[in-house]
UniProtKB/Swiss-Prot annotation:
Region spans: Catalytic loop: 308-316
Keywords: ATP-binding, Cell membrane, Cytoplasm, Endoplasmic reticulum, Endosome, Golgi apparatus, Kinase, Lipid metabolism, Membrane, Nucleotide-binding, Transferase
UniProt-annotated stretches for the region Activation loop: 353-373
Biased composition (Basic and acidic residues): 1-11
Protein name: Phosphatidylinositol 4-kinase type 2-beta
Intracellular or extracellular location(s): Cytoplasm, Cytosol; Golgi apparatus membrane; Endoplasmic reticulum membrane; Cell membrane
Biological classification of the source: Eukaryota, Metazoa, Chordata, Craniata, Vertebrata
Entry's EC annotation: 2.7.1.67
GO biological process: phosphatidylinositol phosphate biosynthetic process
Catalytic reaction list: a 1,2-diacyl-sn-glycero-3-phospho-(1D-myo-inositol) + ATP = a 1,2-diacyl-sn-glycero-3-phospho-(1D-myo-inositol 4-phosphate) + ADP + H(+)
Biological role stated in the UniProt entry: Contributes to the overall PI4-kinase activity of the cell. This contribution may be especially significant in plasma membrane, endosomal and Golgi compartments. The phosphorylation of phosphatidylinositol (PI) to PI4P is the first committed step in the generation of phosphatidylinositol 4,5-bisphosphate (PIP2), a precursor of the second messenger inositol 1,4,5-trisphosphate (InsP3).
Length: 492
């Protein structure tokens, strides 16, 4: 990539029933699938970080760490190996002197990702700072390794489009000039970093493989946008440590406060989808490669639909197309041995779904804008879902235990946010369950992506008697409701 970056149906089969919408809002109760203990397994989640006691002190303008080191670790966290602990040496380092990035992220369940974060921290400590990305309406940064190579994209929570430290003025003018359309009324404000990590979690659970690895981490850099107060306090503490070491060593932290945000691995060789889609119109793909693209496209559709991405244009998903041009082969001429022609591989095409920070709404868009999926107008959206995609997805999402497991994993991720509200989270999951119900029906009926997005919008809420456990029992019921209110500007 270039640097751009209920009436309980106890006697009926245990299936969610897809209802046709009536003129008014319709409500029905359905019983889920029978328990399947094999599906109740742990799933990958986000990176979690535990601060040492001395590092918990909060400076003005930044969020304090939310996970406490003291107290018992939940069985779920212990089972998944998600616990992150700061060592005693970390506490000693934090109690005085300069605090490096290494004290903030100790990732135990993904050594490869931990190594990448470690290299990013080393680069920052050696003066190779993250570079702010000029595109977009928020503060996001290309993170580099000590050699200056881009290895990831970091999006701090405090610099999100509606964050208080957003360094770009686009949203400020939006708020002043058009306050009635400011923000997205269907989204939880300032949770974009969790949405990014949540999209990767959903992608991995469904086996899609289109979202680059994304987790929640903490980083510190001079190039991040800090308030004047934070920078002044940092300078004052450093000065005190230099002039009066006895006093300076008593500070809990020397330097700028860490920022929490999403860290997504950088993908090489990808370009914006718009670029390749235009090129494919004039230079059609070989049949096998076209099928590859269609399969990858269907995975993008499923991801966006399940998480109800409200910001999917053709400029924020990427395509990588590896092929050997005919001209390049002709240039080799006689120097290219005949036996090697048989070893020429077919072109490979891959899709990367980036920019997933505006997803997981707590209600369907029903105010000013519909926030449509822009891929719905592509020719690929008019082709029915392939059998390969149906075989991959249907066995998973047809099992309500799998869906419950997915909701539990998202809960473990989202609850780490300082402003987490369980009631709002349950509304987010109700929308997601409705999307999954529609997707299940569409795959069974052999519908196309465009027909999928035209299906009635559904919310599947947990009934009051429903259990909160991981294994869904037959007595657990969900209420299916059709959302009939449409936004003022609607595309379908």
């Amino acid at each position: 990539m270039e640097p751009k970056q209920t009436a309980d149906a106890r006697d009926s089969p245990p299936l969610l029933v897809f209802l046709e919408p009536a003129a008014e809002e319709v409500t029905a109760h359905t019983a889920p699938l029978s328990p399947n203990p094999q599906s109740a397994r742990a799933a990958p989640g986000s990176a979690v970080r535990f601060f040492s006691d001395s590092a918990r002190e909060e400076e003005a303008g930044e969020d304090e760490p939310l996970l406490k080191k003291s107290g018992p670790v939940s069985p779920r966290a212990a089972r998944k190996g998600r616990t992150r602990l700061s060592s005693s040496s970390d506490r000693e380092n934090m109690s005085g002197g300069h605090v490096g990035n290494g004290e903030f992220n100790v990732i135990l369940d993904d050594l490869e990702f931990a190594d990448i974060i470690h290299r990013a921290e080393q680069a920052i400590e050696s003066g190779v700072f993250p570079e702010r990305i000029s595109q977009g309406s928020s503060g996001s940064y290309f993170v580099k390794d000590p050699k200056g190579k881009i290895i990831g994209v970091f999006k701090p929570k405090s610099e999100e489009p509606y964050g208080h430290l957003n360094p770009k003025w686009t949203k400020y003018f939006h708020k002043i000039c058009c306050p009635c359309c400011f923000g997205r009324g269907c989204l939880v404000p300032n949770q974009g970093y969790l949405s990014e990590a949540g999209a990767y979690l959903v992608d991995e659970k469904l086996g899609l493989g289109v979202v680059p690895k994304t987790k929640v981490v903490w980083l510190v850099s001079e190039t991040f946008n800090y308030s004047a107060i934070d920078r002044a306090k940092s300078r004052g503490k450093k000065y005190a440590l230099e002039k009066v070491p006895k006093v300076g060593r008593k500070f809990h932290r020397i330097g700028l406060p860490p920022k929490v945000g999403s860290f997504q691995l950088f993908v090489d060789g990808y370009k914006e989808a718009d670029y390749w889609l235009r090129k494919f119109e004039t230079d059609p793909l070989p049949e096998n490669t076209r099928k590859q693209l269609q399969c990858q496209f269907e995975k993008l559709v499923i991801l966006d639909y399940v998480i109800r991405n409200t910001d999917r244009g053709n400029d924020n998903w990427l395509i990588r197309y590896d092929s050997q041009d005919d001209d390049e082969l002709m240039e080799k001429g006689d120097d290219f041995p005949l036996k090697d022609w048989k070893e020429i591989k077919e072109p490979v095409i891959k899709i990367a779904a980036i920019d997933n920070g505006l997803a997981f709404p707590f209600k369907h868009p029903d105010e000013w804008r519909a926030y449509p999926f822009h891929w719905a107008w592509l020719p690929q959206a008019k082709v029915p879902f392939s059998q390969e995609t149906r075989d991959l997805i249907l066995p998973r999402i047809s099992d309500m235990n799998f869906v419950q497991d997915l909701c539990e994993d998202l809960y473990e991720l989202f609850k780490t946010d300082k402003g987490f509200d369980k009631a709002t989270f349950e509304k987010q999951m109700s929308v997601m369950r409705g999307q999954i119900l529609n997707l299940t029906q569409a795959l069974k009926d052999g519908k196309t992506p465009i027909q999928l997005v035209q299906m009635p919008r559904v919310v599947v809420e947990r009934s009051c008697s429903g259990s909160q456990g991981r294994i869904v029992q037959m007595s657990n019921a969900f209420t299916q409701t059709f959302h009939c209110r449409k936004p003022f500007f609607s595309s379908w």
